[in-house]
Swiss-Prot record:
CDD domains: GFAT, SIS_GlmS_GlmD_1, SIS_GlmS_GlmD_2. Its EC number is 2.6.1.16. Keywords: Aminotransferase, Cytoplasm, Glutamine amidotransferase, Repeat, Transferase. Residues 2-218 form the Glutamine amidotransferase type-2 domain. This is Glutamine--fructose-6-phosphate aminotransferase [isomerizing]. It comes from the Bacteria. It is an enzyme of class 2 (transferase). PROSITE patterns: GATASE_TYPE_2, SIS. Residues 284-423, 453-591 form the SIS domain.
Length: 601
């Protein structure tokens, strides 16, 4: 949620900042702004709405300079409007600030220090910049004032501060909110995501919580909470900038759906040794083997992937597994086993709720593993181990290829642990994943069929239901989520057997019901559920699998191993959801009110 960019160097900053913000659009936002500094002045450009609107305003001015900060805002305090947009300035105009996060004690700070100050916005961010002015007026240097203010803040924040009287510096701090430092020859940058500033550098340094960073064009000084200078090595962000472009596709979501076969092949390659055997770091395997119970912590689509992963971990590896919604777990931790292993699943590696759980489990001394798409992310750094998805940048808000990558990696982990436990495998996983790859390609090739299904079943509806049994039920939850988040159709996923316990009361003439029928042992049962809803007027869309199909099924996916069907059937649901949204003329990649990376609790 939200995004920050900053540049200080020898070049004009305005265009670099605008391009950087465009690379952060996927994170979700409702307004955007930049502040640019030159020898004469600090000028702020900001607008409600899309960055394209901000660009019009910024491009209408010739003002530019070699220093600047930028921000995309997702409203948390105050409605989306011009006044609440970032950057914010202090009353005297000297200090300019961008901020991601939520300050929990801003009202207390406002009451204690800023009585009589006139505020323009309703935001917690303006309180921060006014506090910097307040302490500066008490005789503190800008660094001292900034450090003092940061010490008073309770909550999450990533901050970038400009001082009109010290035009050669950006002051930076973070806590529980992502922010990176990019380094170059004669310039330095800050960014919420390395993707934003790949246009100028691929070399980055991590910023840790509670650190203060003084950024100049030719040097960077990192200080810990006690004021001690910290030396930190840089790393190269191994991201191909072209991977983050739409190319020939109309939308990022469609591109990312089409990329799933390539992602499957990459995962097979990355998790295979020279002899063609599955491989994962032995320390990870040992921690899984030693665990008496696995607790999967995730949110949204990653939570749904965790539900599928539970099937692998229990059925193949023989490890009891629980899957928890991160935002609930952090406030209502269950009674834990004696030797738990916590597995955190997050595409971005920055999910705030999951990170909050990780902080607590680290305090308890429990082992942890992060499964993420982003090397060097917060969850990756703070967990004991990391397994990477190797899916490439996922830009569309609605996750597609990360979901299938998460399931594939969980299947590989489970099979290796099963082998270590001496449990006889009933599957040649590499061979079966290759079949999955071919099956996904076949479904992608059938995109026109999926578009017709979307037209036939979802063109005018306001409600839709997804049903399945056993592992199909887990996929039905993801299918419903995909549809609702991009088409705004009220969609819900249910276990087929639960229909008669309340949900069937919602079935009316023409109500679309998408039924997944890919599991042999419950095939008759789910088809019985379909008959129940048809008897009440439902319009059934049955997605089955070769070998289990019946006459009249809407679509039949290629045959794959039953436990791997989620990797295949979900692709059909992704495409159906995509076309349902497309036909409603909606913004598929950036649905309303949603953010790609939820970095506040």
């Amino acid at each position: 949620m939200c995004g920050i960019v900053g540049y200080i160097g020898y070049d004009n900053a305005k265009e670099l900042l605008l391009k950087g913000l465009e690379k952060l659009e996927y994170r979700g936002y409702d307004s955007a702004g930049i502040a640019v500094v030159n020898d004469d002045n600090t000028t702020v450009f900001k607008e409600k709405g899309r960055i394209a609107e901000l660009r019009k305003v910024a491009d209408s001015s010739d003002f530019d300079g070699p220093v600047g900060i930028g921000h995309t805002r997702w409203a948390t305090h105050g409605v989306p409007n011009h006044e609440n947009s970032h950057p914010h300035q202090s009353s005297n105009g000297r200090f300019t600030l961008v901020h991601n996060g939520v300050i929990e004690n801003y009202e207390e700070l406002k009451g204690e220090y800023l009585q009589g100050v006139s505020f323009i916005s309703e935001t917690d961010t303006e309180v921060i910049v006014q506090l910097v002015e307040y302490f500066s007026n008490q005789g503190l240097s800008t660094e001292e004032a900034f450090t003092k203010v940061v010490s008073l803040l309770h909550g999450s924040y990533a901050l970038g501060l400009l001082d009109a009287e010290d035009k050669d510096t950006i002051y930076v701090a973070k806590n529980k909110s992502p922010l990176l430092l990019g380094v170059g020859e004669g310039f330095n940058v800050i960014a919420s995501d390395a993707l934003a500033m790949l246009q100028v550098t691929s070399e980055y340094k991590e910023i840790h919580d509670h650190e203060i960073v003084i950024v100049k064009k030719d040097e960077v000084i990192i200080k810990d909470a006690d004021g001690n200078v910290v030396e930190r090595d840089s790393y190269i962000a191994e991201i191909d900038a072209s991977d983050a472009e739409k190319g020939v596709y109309a939308h990022y979501m469609l591109k990312e759906i089409h990329e799933q076969p390539a992602v499957m092949r990459r995962i097979i390659q990355e998790y295979q040794d020279a002899e063609g055997n599955l491989k994962i770091d032995q320390d990870i395997i040992n921690d899984v083997k030693e665990a008496d119970r696995i607790y999967v912590i995730a949110a949204g689509t990653s939570y749904h992937a965790g539900l599928v992963g539970k099937e692998f971990l229990e059925k193949w590896a023989g490890v009891p597994t629980e899957v928890h919604v991160a935002s609930e777990f952090v406030y209502n931790m269950p009674l834990l086993s004696e030797k738990p292993l916590f597995v955190y699943i997050s595409q971005s590696g920055e999910t705030a709720d999951s990170r909050a759980v990780l902080v607590e489990t680290n305090k308890l001394g429990h082992k942890s593993l992060t499964i993420t798409n982003v090397a060097g992310s917060t969850l990756s750094r703070e967990a004991d181990h990391t397994l990477l998805l190797h899916a490439g940048p996922e830009i569309a808000v609605a996750s597609t290829k990360a979901y299938t990558a998460q399931i594939a990696v969980l299947s590989i982990l489970s099979q290796i642990v099963a082998k270590e436990h001496g449990r006889e495998a009933d599957i040649d996983l590499l061979r079966e994943l290759a079949k999955v790859t071919t099956a996904i390609e076949a479904i992608v090739d059938d995109a026109p069929i999926m578009e017709q299904i979307a037209t036939d079943f979802l063109e005018t509806t306001r409600n839709a239901f997804f049903i399945g049994r056993t592992i199909d039920y887990n996929v039905s939850l993801e299918g419903a989520l995909k549809l609702k988040e991009i088409s705004y159709i009220q969609a819900e996923g249910f276990a087929g057997g639960e229909l008669k316990h309340g949900t069937i009361a919602l079935i009316e003439d023409g109500t679309p019901v998408v039924a997944l029928a890919t599991q042999e042992n419950v095939n008759l049962s789910i088809r019985g559920n379909v008959k129940e809803v048809v008897a009440r007027g439902a319009h059934p869309c049955i997605i089955s699998m070769e070998g289990l199909e019946k006459e009249g099924d809407t679509y039949v996916i290629p045959h794959v191993h039953e436990l791997l069907t989620p990797l295949v059937s979900v692709v059909a649901l992704q495409l159906i959801s995509y076309y349902a949204a497309l036909h409603r003329d909606l913004d598929v990649d950036k649905p309303r009110n949603l953010a790609k990376s939820v970095t506040v609790e």
